[in-house]
Every structure is written in structure tokens, then in C-alpha cells.
Amino acid sequence: MNELFRMDGSIRKTYWAVVDNKPEPSEATLEHWLVRNEKQNKSYAFLKEQKEAKKASLAYHYIASSDRFHLLEIELHTGRHHQIRAQLAAIGLHIKGDLKYGFSRSNKDGGIHLHARSIIFTHPVTQELIKIIAPVPEDPLWQFFEKHENA
């Protein structure tokens, strides 16, 4: 199984993020160069290649809105340090509770509204397509968005 997780493109990971602004356009592929600052435990996104930067790519699409927040589904094409947080912040979309990447205040529990929603892969022996969907956290906002996912 470990080999499967290391192979490029053999696994599809999707995440849900609750953000402060509605994205325009409603879906897009983002490509940035990420520079990791070890001391700050933070990554910075740039549009052009930088020294010691790693290319990062993700696709997002808008799913739904509450009165103040917006739900995005994100598919990672690369797996970089704080990639989703850094890339969304670079286009003005801040994840609820994420002070490090620009959201205005923390969540009461100290967490952020970023959820590993699903993983899809082909079983290495049976070749069966496996899809695992993680339930959303016990939180009213997550519960709201789960109900409105297909609305």
C-alpha cells in the first residue's frame, strides 16, 4: 500500500475548505511555486519560480454558500507543505479559523475548516476502484454544508 501512496497520479485526494470569500471563477486550477519557511512553519505562494521553490498544483470548485462562508472542494495534484492553505490565501480565499494564512480570527477549538473529504484509488491486487468518504466533523457549519452539498 505504501508504494501506491508514493506513485504519482495513482491516488485522488479531495478536501473540503470553508472560506471567507466566494471564488471567482467558481472553479479553476491553481499553479504556484511554494517556498517553505521552516522557522515560521509556513509556505509562501508565488506565481513565478523562486529559489528553492517547489511547484504546486490544485483544482478547486465551488459547492455552496452559507450566509457568511463558502464551501470549496479541492483536488490536490501535488502534495506540498500547507499547499491548500497557501494557494487559497494567495488568491484571497482564507480558510475559516486559519490565522496563519490570513483569516481574521481563530475558531473556538483552535482548528481550521479544512477537511480531508475523500480518497479514491485502484486496489493494487484486485484492480477494484476504492472510494473512501470521511464524515464531516461534528460542527454546525460542516453539518450545514454536508446537507447542501448536492443542493
PLM feature segments, named:
Residues 1-151:
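RNA pseudouridine synthases
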